[in-house]
C-alpha cells in the first residue's frame, strides 16, 4: 500500500539493528477466511521468535496474507539497551563543536551558558526557559535525522547535493551535542537538572530547532540560510529572529506592481493588469541599510548579502527568496524570557508630560463612540443576551485556570484544582458564588500571570483574572463581535472572509496617486499610555449606553462591565521571582480579559483614525479603506495628484511625528505598493504568508497526548508547506512513527501502520497523500473504521465520580432550569455532556482516559475485534455513491495568474485552472433560520451536530424543542409550517456535510468549489427532486476531480447515473451520519 509502511519497516531495522531484534508484522482482513490466515500467521510468528527461529519461511508460506491482507501494525522486540543514539552519533560528530559567545544577549540567562552557571543548585533550576514542550525527545529527533542520512547516502545527482548539504549541517549539530553527551529526557519528556547541569542550558531546544531547519534544506540557498541561523542561534537566543525578519517591512515597499488581483463588487478576486510603481524615498533606503548593518554586526553574512543582491533589481520573480528568509527566521525557536523581565518590559516606557492632550481626547472619544455604536441597538431593544448575560457566560465558561489552586469537594472525592469551571461549581454549592461582585485586583489581591511565547518577539504576559471578570464581560463582548462581524474595518472578524479578501481590498485602491500607511501597534497595546484613555473611553461609552434603557438587568450587565474596567485601572500583578512572589503595580493593558481582542481592535481603529484626522489638516486625500487586524492597522489614502518621493517622505515623517505626539512607540511605514503585517504581507501585488510554525519545539505544554501532538506536527507541516517552507516528508513520517508507537513493555513496542493512522477514525493522524483528505471506501478500510468506532469513547472513574456528585448535578440542573422553559432532553443532555467534557482539562481525568484509550488501542492493534458498528459514517455514504460514477479524461486550461507564489506546484495548478475563493463556506449552521430563531429568544447556541439531529425529528418534536428554549408558540408553529423549515433541512445537512469533509481546512479552503470550470466536468442527469442527494453527488464529484488533479496534475470528468430507487435510501442514510473527532480534526481545528 503505502510508502509509510515501507519507511516504517526500514526505520525499525535501523533502530533495532542488533541480533536480538525481531519485527513481527500483524495483518488483518475483512474477508473471514483470509482473516483466520492472518491470525494463524501472527501466532506462528510469535512462536518462532520465542524459539529464536527465523521468520523467513513463514513469510513465504503465508504469502497470501502479505499480498492480500492489510498491514495493521508491526510488533518489535529488542533486548539491547537503547543507547544506540550515542553510538550512532559519534559517526557524524566529526566537526568542530560550536562555542557559545556568552556576551551576545543583554539578559544573562539568555546566554547559552553551562546550566550550572545559570542555576548553581537543583532547587534554583527551572526548565521553563528552554523546555521544548513537545512529547518527543532530542534522541528521537537525532535518530530520525541519522535514519534519513543513512538511507540516502547513496543518492545521486541533485539528490546527492541535498544529502551533502544536510550531512554538513548535521555534522555541526552532532559534533556540538556529542561534545556534551545527548541529554536524556525523563518520562514526561523533560530535561532535569542532573542531566543538564554540565551542558549548555539551551542545548536541547537549539538542537531541535537546528534539526527542523536542516531537514528543511533542499537548495543551496536553503543551506546558506540554515547554516547561518543554526550557528548563530546557538549563541544568540534573544534577537536573531527579529534582526533577520525586520527588513521585510521595508522590502514589500520596493517591488513594482505589474498586474495584480483586486476584490470586485461581488467580493471575488479579479485580475487587474494595472501597473503601480514603487516610489521609495532615500530615507527608506537608509533605514534598510541600517537594518542590514545591524544584521552584519550580529555576525550574519550570507543572509544580508542575499538581500543586498536582490536590491539591485527588486524583482518579484526573485522575491520568494526574501519570503523564504523571512519564514526561516522564525524556525530558530521560541524566545522564552523570565516572567519578571516580560512584565517589566511593558513598564519601562517612561511617562512624559509632553503629550498632545487634544489627540488623547480625540482617541478616547472615538473609542467611546465606537463602543456606543456597537451596542446601542442591543441596549435599546433590551436584547435578551444582555439580560441573561450571566447564564450565557456560564454556558461558555472555559476550563482554563482561575489563577489559584483550591481544594474542592465533589461528593466523597476531594481534589485540588485551578480550573474555572470547577471553582464555579464549588462556589455555587457553598453559597460563595457572587457574580454581582467583581473582585479587586489591587495590591491586596494581585493578578497571577500566564505567558505567551513567540519566536522573534519578547515574551508577553497574560492576566489570569478571576472568573467573575469573564462572566461580567462575556455578553457585551459577544455583542461587540457580532457588530464587528459585519463591519469591513475589522478584518479579523469580518463575516466569513478569509485573508484573500483583505488582500484584494488593499490592492484594489493602489494606484499612482495613492499610498498605503501600515503600522504595527503591538507596542502601543501593551503600553502604559494606552491604559487610561483606553479604559476611560470604554467606561464613558458604557455610561452613555446605560442611559438608553430602563431595563434593570441590562443596566446591571453594563455596570458590571464598567466595574471590570474601573478595577483594572488599578491593577497589581504577582510574579514569582525565585521563591519570592513579587507584587508589582502594573499600569498597562494585558491579554486575558474576554474583551482583549475586540477592545484592542476598537482601540487600534480609533488610533489610526486619530492619526489620519491629524494628517488631513496638512494634506488633502480621501481615505479609501481603513482596516485593523489584530495588532496591525493599515489605510489606503488617495491624493489628487500623482505621488512623488518627496510626498512619501513627508507623509511618512508626519505620520511618525503624529504617533510620537501620543508617545506611541510604534513602527509606522508608508508605501505605494505593498504592506507587511503580522498575519500576511503583500509585495509586487502578490500575497505571502509567513511559514513560521515551529515543528520540534512547542510554545507550552497542554494535556494533549503523543498522538495528538503527532497530528499537530503533521498539520503544522502542511500549513508551512502551503506557505512556502517545506520540511522533508520522510522526516515528518519518521516523527509520526516515533510519536504514535506504543510501548507494551520495556523491550516490546507496537507501531501502527499507515492504514490505522490515515483512515478517518477516532485515531486518524495524517493523510497518506499531502493536501488530499481520503475517505476510504474499500472493505478493509470500512472494516477497520468500524472496529475503531467500537472503542472510541473511554470512561474515566474520576470524571464519573465528579459527574455523580450533587455539586455537579446541581450545577447542571441550575443551568438547565435557567435556560429551559419546559423539559428538553436534547439540551439538558447536551449541557451535561459539555460540562463533563470540560473536566477533561483536569490532568488526572485526561490521564485516566488516556490509559484506557491506550490499552484498548493495544488490544485492537494486535487483533481487530469483529465488531459490526451500525453507525453510518461519511465513508459509508461515499461508498454507496462511488460505483455509479464513471471517469473519462478531460482538459482544463490554465486561465488565472498566480497570486500566491509560495504555494506548492500541484495546489497552484488547481487554483490557476478553477480559481480561488475569498469566503469561508458556512459549516456551522449559523445561517439557518432555526439557528437565527433560537438566538433571537435564547442565549443557547446549539452546535451543528445538535441542529442536524433536531432538524430531522418529527415536526411536533421540533416545536417542543423550540418552545422549551423560550421561543413563543406562535413563532415555533409558523416555523414548522413554513417552507423555510424544509429549506433549513437542506441547509443544515449541507453545513453538516461540509463540516465532516473539512472543506474549510488545508488547501481545500483555497479552491473555488462553485467554479463553473469545475461544474462543467460533472454530468449528473436530473432525476426527481431530492436536493440533498444532488448536493452530495456533486460535492463528491468535485472532491474526486480536485483530488485527482492534485495527485496527477491533470483533469478528469465524471458522469453519474444514479438510480432513482437508490436516491431515497441514500437520503435516509444521510440523516444518520456520525461525526468522527480525531487527533487529526482537532489539529485542523487548532490551526484555526
Curated annotation (Swiss-Prot):
Which cofactors does this protein require? Mg(2+)
Query: Which EC numbers does the record give?
Result: 2.7.7.48
Domain RdRp catalytic stretches: 501-687
Q: What keywords were assigned to this record?
A: Magnesium, Nucleotide-binding, Nucleotidyltransferase, RNA-binding, RNA-directed RNA polymerase, Transferase, Viral RNA replication, Virion
- Entries under Pfam families matching the protein: RdRP_4, Rotavirus_VP1
GO CC annotation: virion component
Cell location: Virion
Q: Which reaction does it catalyse?
A: RNA(n) + a ribonucleoside 5'-triphosphate = RNA(n+1) + diphosphate
Q: Could you mention a single GO BP entry for this protein?
A: viral genome replication
Q: Which InterPro entries match?
A: DNA/RNA_pol_sf (IPR043502), RNA-dir_pol_4-hel_dom (IPR042032), RNA-dir_pol_luteovirus (IPR001795), RNA-dir_pol_reovirus (IPR007097), Rotavirus_VP1_C (IPR022071)
Molecular function GO terms recorded = nucleotide binding; RNA binding; RNA-directed RNA polymerase activity
Q: Which domain of life is it from?
A: Viruses
Cysteines joined through disulfide linkages: none
The record's similarity note reads: Belongs to the reoviridae RNA-directed RNA polymerase family.
Q: What does this protein do?
A: RNA-directed RNA polymerase that is involved in both transcription and genome replication. Together with VP3 capping enzyme, forms an enzyme complex positioned near the channels situated at each of the five-fold vertices of the core. Following infection, the outermost layer of the virus is lost, leaving a double-layered particle (DLP) made up of the core and VP6 shell. VP1 then catalyzes the transcription of fully conservative plus-strand genomic RNAs that are extruded through the DLP's channels into the cytoplasm where they function as mRNAs for translation of viral proteins.
Subunit field text:
Interacts with VP3 (Potential). Interacts with VP2; this interaction activates VP1. Interacts with NSP5; this interaction is probably necessary for the formation of functional virus factories. Interacts with NSP2; this interaction is weak.
Q: What protein name applies here?
A: RNA-directed RNA polymerase
Could you tell me which species this protein originates from?
Answer: Rotavirus A (isolate RVA/Human/United Kingdom/A64/1987/G10P11[14]) (RV-A)
